[in-house]
Regions:
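C-terminal substrate-binding/active-site "lid" region of AdoMet-derived donor-dependent transferases
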Residues: 165-245
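SAM cofactor-binding core of SAM-dependent methyltransferases
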Residues: 49-141
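Alpha-helix termini
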Residues: 28, 67-72, 93-103, 148-153, ...
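Active-site segment flanking the S-adenosylmethionine/decSAM binding pocket
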Residues: 80, 132-195
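Short, well-ordered secondary-structure micro-motifs
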Residues: 88, 119-122, 145-148, 171-172, ...
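General small-molecule cofactor/ligand-binding pocket signal
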Residues: 7, 11, 108, 134-136, ...
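Active-site flanking loop/helix segments enriched in acidic
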Residues: 40-49
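N-terminal auxiliary segments of SAM/dcSAM-dependent transferases
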Residues: 1-33
Length: 245
């Protein structure tokens, strides 16, 4: 399937999701990002399959973030799509800190597609977490450089890679170059099996570039069952990296 056809399918699914969510009473989702993330999962299961970060994977990521010490303050997401995972990151941070989340606790999520950005912003606003989750339009590498230059991102506690797999490694290495990782930082990469990110996998499984004083990675893979029934069920690896500087 060509990228153009894939883009059309994504656009159609996003439009259908918007209609599905906003046809329901706003009170179902106001100030409740978990309910909204759950509704997106339900839509994908029942109305039209979408390439979202599924609940089974999210549960693993949530467990890691909830246990992280010190508690996470800055999360980067490369690839917003419709915003399901961004909603979840914001919800997790609110679960950690309570209703009064400190101003320096933020999720920055990046996507070059204006339709996806608009939808994600509307969903984040509906869920009442727009003070935590910032949906930014453009290539993640460019935006991260700007945020770093502006002093808005000084360290990264977790980075989530769920965009085009060919950019996983360059964007991981950009975080290294900007010296944003700390000991105990977490990186999560989705879809490392299919379509696949072989260069990224080789790099992180080798522990990094191997030079003295560089970031070193410890990787752990998980397999989760896709929730689409026994016929189409399959295992999906989720790669977590634990940074030791």
């Amino acid at each position: 399937m060509s990228s153009g056809n894939l883009g059309q399918i994504f656009a159609q699914r996003a439009s259908e999701l918007r209609e599905y969510i906003f046809s329901q009473p706003a009170s179902n989702f106001e100030n409740n990002p978990w309910a909204l993330a759950g509704a997106i999962e339900t839509f994908s299961n029942t109305k039209g399959h979408m390439m979202i970060f599924r609940d089974a994977k999210l549960a693993i990521a949530k467990e890691q973030l909830m246990a992280q010490q010190p508690a996470p303050r800055t999360i980067l997401e490369f690839g917003t799509f419709v915003g399901k995972s961004a909603l979840a990151w914001g919800a997790i941070l609110r679960d950690i800190y309570g209703e009064r989340v400190p101003e320096d606790v933020n999720v920055y999520t990046f996507d070059p597609n204006p339709q996806m950005v608009a939808l994600a912003r509307d969903l984040v606003k509906l869920a009442g977490i727009e003070d935590i989750v910032h949906v930014l339009e453009g290539p993640g590498s460019d935006i991260l450089k700007r945020l770093y230059a502006e002093g808005k991102v000084a360290s990264v506690d977790m980075a989530f890679f769920d965009h085009w797999e060919e950019f996983y490694l360059p964007d991981l290495q950009l975080i290294e170059e900007l010296k944003l990782w700390r000991v105990g930082s977490l990186a999560i990469a989705d879809n490392t099996d299919f379509p696949g990110a072989p260069e990224y996998l080789a790099y992180v499984k080798a522990g990094g570039n191997g030079t003295a004083g560089s970031v070193k990675y410890e990787s752990k893979s998980y397999e989760t069952q896709a929730g689409r029934g026994p016929v189409s069920a399959f295992l999906i690896p989720l790669l977590l990296l634990f940074v030791s500087c």
